[in-house]
């Protein structure tokens, strides 16, 4: 009986760890902390170009967006060493959701 209670408790703990926030929520957090200052809270642009629906960014492939973030063309800061691939994927997923694609 003791073993089955321990197994149930362990499975609940492990299961809870698997149900973290969606990558879209993670993407919005990354955008808010690293991108909003230049690209705006509504992705309409500002210091940096617009990223929302109908923008040039909306025509880029996912890989092109990742490359832009990593390289930081023009006046944009390079985020090459700041984001993991999983974080980049989450950020692209967030942008695509906001762009309606």
Task: Label the predicted regions.
Residues 6-16:
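Bacterial N-terminal signal peptides
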Residues 24-28, 32, 37-71:
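Gly/Gly-Pro-rich "capping" loops immediately C-terminal to redox-active cysteine motifs
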Residues 41, 79-80:
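Surface-exposed loop and edge beta-strand positions of immunoglobulin-like domains
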């Amino acid at each position: 009986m003791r073993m089955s209670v321990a197994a149930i408790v362990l499975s609940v703990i492990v299961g809870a760890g698997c149900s973290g926030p969606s990558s879209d929520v993670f993407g919005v957090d990354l955008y808010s902390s690293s991108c909003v200052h230049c690209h705006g809270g509504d992705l309409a642009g500002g210091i940096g170009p617009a990223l929302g629906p109908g923008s040039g960014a909306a025509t880029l492939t996912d890989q092109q967006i990742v490359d832009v973030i990593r390289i930081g063309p023009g006046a944009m800061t390079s985020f090459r060493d700041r984001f993991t691939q999983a974080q980049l994927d989450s950020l692209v997923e967030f942008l695509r959701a906001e762009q309606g694609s």
